[in-house]
């Protein structure tokens, strides 16, 4: 039986630009910055159990925590460490950065494997290897898991090249942790797992060993490097699976897309499946399994970090809104820079994430602090998703909705 719900959402703003040339230049600058960057990691252990809040511009600890982990051992050897360098950034660059004082303060908000053994709690960022701590997380605890594992690709890391595994080896690697993650999901829970064209078939085979695959979402990245002897890779897949196909939550009404209608169709002079407004004609459309409205974070967006494979908040917002309800628990065993945790917090869900790289955990912690003051999600406003380059339409829509609510309250 499907559970349905309706929720109102706070005002948000969209960070997309309508000028393609500016967006292209932004992407080029970010790529240049990333190519010059050496990733960093810290040392030391956090105390765990901290709430992500900001008070009087200072980070305070009030009782929660959260993180994520797991790394493919063959591709990233343990003896390779990450380092950071200071960058000169443009004045409008909003990429998340850390001062030394922030590193020290945020580090106290991050849990580790030892603090997890002392007791699990919701809203933790755990700086640890997933395989070393996953058994300390309770079974059947999470309503939804979002997984963005290492893809089976050739990589250059700190100047060293690592080769991809065979499909059989990669599937063995997936089984090594996927079965354990499945145990953490409730009997009526759901899962989304990301992959690219090369590893998506392996992911499907392993997922189907434990869960029922319901669909495959393909989303378009406007980024991607060109290739001389192959097609440019600008698409990624997200597999949607559930434990029980007869009992899971999916709320399509929470992920509707508002699109402008360029050629409206009328029946006897009345709008057909669209709304006529002073600002134009719009239609509420059901989401398909192909998404071309997602912007990959770049330097002028508040959510942007230096993580090389950061997922957009808008992308995860669709997954979380469709397959969970406020108060539900979200697990991300490969947290990265914290997108799943941040979006879960903005949408009033609990989270737990594991990440092996301390630098990424610190970025996630800062983003969680910022989410207290800014709950906006690019491309999502007042319970509605918007297509690319529709910032003006979205702002008008939100403003009129707000004015309408004020009039009703005054009556």
What label would you give each PLM region?
Residues 23-24, 37, 43, 69:
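Intrinsic disorder/low-complexity segments
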Residues 2-12, 17, 27, 31-32, ...:
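Core catalytic lobe of class I
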Residues 355, 367-370:
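Catalytic-site neighborhood detector that most strongly recognizes the C-terminal catalytic loop/helix
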């Amino acid at each position: 039986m499907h559970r349905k719900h309706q929720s109102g959402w706070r005002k948000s703003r969209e960070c997309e630009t309508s000028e393609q040339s500016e967006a292209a230049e932004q992407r080029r600058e970010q790529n240049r910055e990333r190519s010059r960057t050496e990733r960093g990691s810290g040392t030391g252990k956090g105390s765990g159990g901290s709430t992500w809040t900001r008070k009087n511009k200072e980070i305070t600890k009030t009782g929660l925590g959260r993180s994520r982990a797991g790394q493919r051992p063959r591709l990233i050897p343990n003896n390779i460490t990450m380092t950071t360098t200071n960058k000169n950034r443009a004045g409008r660059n909003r990429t998340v950065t850390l001062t030394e004082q922030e590193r020290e303060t945020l580090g106290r908000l991050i849990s580790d494997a030892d603090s997890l053994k002392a007791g699990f709690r919701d809203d933790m960022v755990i700086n640890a290897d997933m395989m070393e701590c996953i058994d300390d997380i309770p079974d059947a605890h999470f309503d939804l898991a979002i997984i963005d594992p290492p893809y089976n690709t050739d990589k250059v890391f700190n100047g060293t090249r690592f080769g991809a595994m065979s499909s059989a080896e990669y599937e063995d690697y997936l089984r090594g942790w996927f079965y354990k993650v499945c145990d953490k999901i409730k009997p009526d829970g759901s899962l989304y797992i990301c992959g690219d064209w090369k590893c998506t078939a392996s992911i499907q085979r392993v997922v189907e060993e434990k869960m029922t695959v319901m669909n495959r979402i393909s989303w378009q990245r406007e980024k991607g490097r060109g290739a001389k002897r192959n097609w440019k890779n600008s698409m990624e897949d997200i597999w949607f699976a559930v434990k029980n196909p007869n009992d899971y939550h999916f709320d399509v009404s929470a992920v509707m897309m508002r699109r402008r209608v360029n050629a409206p169709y009328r029946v006897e002079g009345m709008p057909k499946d669209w709304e006529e407004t002073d600002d134009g004609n719009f239609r509420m459309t059901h989401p398909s399994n192909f998404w071309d409205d997602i912007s990959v974070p770049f330097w002028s967006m508040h959510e942007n970090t230096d993580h090389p494979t950061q997922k957009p908040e808008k992308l995860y917002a669709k997954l979380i809104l469709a397959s969970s309800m406020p108060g539900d628990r979200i697990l991300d065993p490969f947290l990265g820079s914290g997108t799943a945790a941040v979006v879960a917090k903005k949408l009033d869900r609990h989270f737990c994430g594991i990440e092996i790289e301390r630098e990424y955990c610190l970025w996630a912690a800062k983003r969680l602090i910022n989410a207290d003051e800014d709950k906006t999600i690019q491309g999502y406003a007042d319970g509605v998703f918007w297509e690319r380059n529709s910032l003006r339409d979205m702002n008008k829509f939100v403003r009129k909705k707000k004015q309408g609510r004020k009039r009703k309250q005054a009556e």
